């Protein structure tokens, strides 16, 4: 809940800026000005960098005499109160305007974040540059030695942070109401319900998290470029990348790079610059769909019992954001040749732990012995296919995963994949196409419309066709929707 609140906060106040959301409340105390942070770039363009806080400050690793305390500039940042609600019935407000929805049943998830008045603390950069002149970093420091051994890691220094001024509360309220006699309702979080044979079931769940004063909710860093002799410079200009001199950049993967080649999307745009093409963004998505069919082929080739079991776990993940948030870093660790930590598993409930272990076993990973991860080439390919889908799901907007899960229950995922392939250059598909027949149903189309809207695609049903329009500044969400739909479709594909 804390991670969701901080992400929503930055989405509102610093959407295109350099601030980074704090995802774990326990990390707040570690975020001191001039603390050293490592930034690890990940494999696919949509994955956000991974930051790790070191138990050192910049002054701790300099060879010269004691480093002076930084000059800190403090200012009021903003008084922030955000309220976010997802409605299954009624009107959905999007950047496209109002999208009318007409669904059976109703569901509302409301998350309210009230951080109140926030304080910004930042280092005086000009003074920091003057204080750092002619100084060198001790690259023999044991902690930095471990950083140097890492793959694609960049050393950064924390130069600004946003903190709360008073105690605040983050609350999440969930109400689920399902029409059991017809359409499948939408659940955006796992809630235990007792359904009657043909009636309405309502269950409320309230969760409150208290945040103490002086809690850091966001921070900013500057990358360092470190030379072989320990001299360093601050990367102040956008586009200037940090790193270590003569350290060869390699794929941030532990497995055979050939396994990744099909997934690299070399021709796809970087996530930061949006989807663009001379033929238009819809054309890019259609090209991606053709490539994705090949990428997810290992799913379609699985024996039916294994495919069904893996599909069931993915559907459980779609309705369980806590499990999804743990599953991605576990896959990250396995890619790097690391075993999942006991602490990570301890964050999960017993049923979630069972699903996680079952997932890893189904994709060929062993948690026993000295070498974690898949062993043979076939298992590596299967694991990477699963990791590919997990990483895309993890970066989807809030509620999109649950909407995908609802579409799985309605068995319309193949219909949506076909819709993307069948779109004309101007974004129109004929509803007389037999495969698109489910979209004639008003309730089903409303759910699909909301799913596409969450991925910055406006979907409008005309008299005998469907028209799709991608937002001008949509960035990577349409591509992520394309990836997740194709992955789930491959898992549900019938064996020939």
Curated annotation (Swiss-Prot):
Effect of residue 137 to T: In an uterine corpus endometrioid carcinoma sample; somatic mutation; reduced ability to induce pyroptosis
Molecular function per GO: cardiolipin binding; phosphatidylinositol-4,5-bisphosphate binding; wide pore channel activity
UniProt activity-regulation remark: (Microbial infection) Activated upon human coronavirus SARS-CoV-2 infection, leading to lung epithelial cell death. Activation takes place in response to (1) activation of NLRP1 and (2) inactivation of GSDMD following NLRP1 and GSDMD cleavage by the SARS-CoV-2 3C-like proteinase nsp5.
Sites marked Cleavage: 270-271
Domain of life of the native organism: Eukaryota
GO cellular component terms listed in the entry, alphabetical order: cytoplasm; cytosol; membrane; plasma membrane
InterPro entries reported for this sequence: Gasdermin_pore (IPR040460), Gasdermin_PUB (IPR041263), GSDME (IPR042377)
Tissue specificity field: Expressed in cochlea. Low level of expression in heart, brain, placenta, lung, liver, skeletal muscle, kidney and pancreas, with highest expression in placenta.
Effect on the protein of changing residue 44 to C: In a lung cancer adenocarcinoma sample; somatic mutation; reduced ability to induce pyroptosis
List of residues that carry S-(2-succinyl)cysteine: 45, 156, 168, 180, 235, 371, 408, 417, 489
Keywords for the protein's UniProt record, in alphabetical order: Cell membrane, Cytoplasm, Deafness, Isopeptide bond, Lipoprotein, Membrane, Necrosis, Non-syndromic deafness, Palmitate, Transmembrane, Transmembrane beta strand, Tumor suppressor, Ubl conjugation
Phenotype upon changing residue 388 to D: Low spontaneous pyroptosis-inducing activity
Domain comment as written in the entry: Intramolecular interactions between N- and C-terminal domains may be important for autoinhibition in the absence of activation signal. The intrinsic pyroptosis-inducing activity is carried by the N-terminal domain, that is released upon cleavage by CASP3 or granzyme B (GZMB).
Protein family membership: Belongs to the gasdermin family.
Protein name: Gasdermin-E
Taxonomic lineage of the native organism: Eukaryota, Metazoa, Chordata, Craniata, Vertebrata
């Amino acid at each position: 809940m804390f991670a969701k609140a901080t992400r929503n906060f930055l989405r509102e106040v610093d959407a295109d800026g350099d601030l980074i959301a704090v995802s774990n409340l326990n990390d707040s105390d570690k975020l001191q000005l001039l603390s050293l942070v490592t930034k690890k770039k990940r494999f696919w363009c949509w994955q956000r960098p991974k930051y790790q806080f070191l138990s050192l400050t910049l002054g701790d690793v300099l060879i010269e005499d004691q480093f002076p305390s930084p000059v800190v500039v403090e200012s009021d940042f903003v008084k922030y109160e955000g309220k976010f609600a997802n409605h299954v019935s009624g009107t959905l407000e999007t950047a496209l305007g109002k999208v009318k929805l007409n669904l059976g049943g109703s569901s509302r998830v409301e998350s309210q974040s009230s951080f109140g008045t926030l304080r910004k603390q930042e280092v005086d950069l000009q003074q920091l540059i003057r204080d750092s002149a002619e100084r060198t970093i001790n690259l023999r420091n044991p902690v930095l030695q471990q950083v140097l051994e890492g793959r694609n890691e960049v050393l950064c220094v924390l130069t600004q942070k946003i903190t709360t001024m008073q105690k605040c509360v983050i609350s999440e309220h969930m109400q689920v109401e399902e029409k059991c006699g017809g359409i499948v309702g939408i659940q955006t979080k796992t809630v235990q319900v007792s359904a009657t044979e043909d009636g309405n079931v309502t269950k409320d769940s309230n969760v409150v998290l208290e945040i103490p004063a002086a809690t850091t909710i966001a921070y900013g860093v500057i990358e360092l470029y470190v030379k072989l002799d320990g001299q360093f410079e601050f990367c102040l200009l956008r586009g200037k990348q940090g790193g270590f001199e003569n350290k060869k950049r390699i794929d941030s993967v532990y497995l055979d790079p050939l396994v990744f080649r099909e997934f690299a999307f070399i021709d796809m745009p970087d996530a930061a610059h949006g989807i663009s093409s001379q033929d238009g963004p819809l054309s890019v998505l259609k090209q991606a769909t053709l490539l994705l069919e090949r990428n997810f082929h290992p799913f379609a080739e699985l024996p039916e019992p294994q495919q069904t079991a893996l599909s069931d776990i993915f559907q459980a993940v779609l309705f369980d954001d806590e499990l999804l948030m743990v599953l991605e870093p576990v896959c990250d660790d396995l890619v790097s040749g690391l075993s999942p930590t006991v602490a990570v598993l301890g964050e999960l409930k017993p049923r979630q732990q069972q699903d996680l272990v079952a997932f890893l076993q189904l994709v060929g990973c062993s948690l026993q012995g000295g070498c974690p991860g898949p062993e043979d080439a076939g298992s590596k390919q299967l694991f990477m296919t699963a990791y590919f889908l997990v990483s895309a799901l993890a970066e989807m907007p809030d509620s999109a995963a649950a909407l995908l899960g609802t579409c799985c229950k309605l068995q319309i995922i193949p219909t949506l994949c076909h819709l993307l392939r069948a779109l004309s250059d101007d974004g129109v598909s004929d509803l007389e196409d037999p495969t698109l027949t489910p979209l004639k149903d008003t309730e089903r189309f409303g759910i699909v419309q909301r799913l596409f809207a969450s991925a910055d695609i406006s979907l409008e049903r005309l008299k005998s066709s469907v028209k799709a329009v991608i937002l001008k500044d949509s960035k990577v969400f349409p591509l992520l929707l394309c990836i997740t739909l194709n992955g789930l479709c491959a898992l549900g594909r019938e064996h020939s």
